């Protein structure tokens, strides 16, 4: 059961469409995709620079920039327009909502992209995807990648 369904059941409340706060922020790259590569250590993927190296030729050919979002202490990835630590949650929502695609690790930003029906490519590590996938949005626009084989249980990090 998805965590949203569990919370709804426990609260005795129906599931509705979330209304996320949105505040304007100037965008210095357009068109663009968003990337939030970092999250808690058990969900961190170590090869984002290689991913960007693979994506850049295709994105550059189409004039698409990469906007990195996240916390101020997170590493800056190469070839990105850096917004991490410079925006509020509402401003980050604005960036996600207006992007062509959201790419990242399992985090709140992937769920926000789902709410805004922005296409998603998201990496999952230690959570069972069927319990935590972006609940809202068109599922045909969501590519959820996991190293876990179908039908098996994920390994859980000790944090």
Predicted feature residues:
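Catalytic machinery of carbohydrate-active enzymes
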Residues: 1-159
């Amino acid at each position: 059961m998805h965590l949203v369904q569990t919370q709804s059941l426990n609260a005795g409340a129906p599931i509705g469409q979330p209304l996320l706060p949105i505040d304007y922020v100037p965008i210095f790259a357009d068109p663009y995709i968003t990337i939030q590569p970092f999250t808690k250590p058990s969900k961190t993927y170590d090869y984002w620079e290689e991913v960007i190296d693979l994506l850049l030729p295709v994105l550059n050919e189409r004039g698409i920039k990469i906007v990195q979002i996240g916390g101020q202490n997170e590493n800056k990835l190469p070839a990105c327009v850096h917004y991490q630590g410079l925006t509020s949650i509402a401003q980050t929502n604005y960036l996600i909502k207006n992007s062509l695609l959201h790419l990242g690790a399992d985090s709140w930003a992937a769920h926000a992209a789902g709410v805004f029906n922005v296409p998603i490519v998201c990496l999952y590590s230690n959570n069972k995807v069927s319990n935590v996938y972006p609940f809202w949005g068109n599922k045909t626009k969501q590519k959820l990648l996991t190293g876990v084989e179908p039908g098996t249980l994920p390994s859980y990090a000790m944090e």
